[in-house]
Amino acid sequence: THRELVEGVEAGKVDFAILPIENSIVGEVRDSIDLINKRNIYIVGEVKHKIEHNLLGIKGSKIDDIKRVYSHEQALMQCSEFLGKYPEWEKIRMNNTALSAKYIGDTGNKENACIANMETRKMYNLELLQPDVNNEKENFTRFFIVSNKNLICENSEKISVITSTKNEAGALMKLLKVFSDYGLNMVNLKSRPKTNKPWEYYFYIDFEGNLEEEKVEKALEEIREKSIYLQILGNYKVYNVEI
């Protein structure tokens, strides 16, 4: 699970982990954002992956056999138009698409299918029932590479922070104005509810820059003054490649 990955990195059991953070169709992967909040881990890179979903079953099965479809929640949402053609199918959430493929392979039940990629088809010797069941063909997911070491290279170009403001009129607006004042391009802003504090939120922000830049240093100083909490998650390079 994502939690196990993050906890493994934080404890030093693994050097790096890759977490999905946002999909181009259905938006943010909320549990990933919540998991990296207030943890001793850092974002050290970002990569983009083109998503191709396929309906897979066990060898010898046909679409007419299917009664249940297993996959990750995001994959089920990204294939909702195809799945909507089969309202009688039970849609069952799994921790990830690879686990769903392994599960149906282990059960050997022709009534079970999964949504996963072609690699899992080969890995678990599954039948391709329907290729490319995505709602949209141009379907991409951004992934963060995380580590318990704050690794920053000279050409790091993006910064991610989590912050929280006082619950008073204009507090968030004043904080966001800092980005404009220093000419920093904010490329992402998300609000997430605070644990055990109803109707209170923290904010996840991505912006372009390098921590060595003077304007970035000054902007973060002002943001810290205007917030009640600020965590710099990382300053990293974006790898515009498909993995």
Regions found by a protein language model. Give the residues of each.
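Domain-level signature for soluble enzymes in the chorismate/prephenate branch of the shikimate pathway
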Residues: 1-243
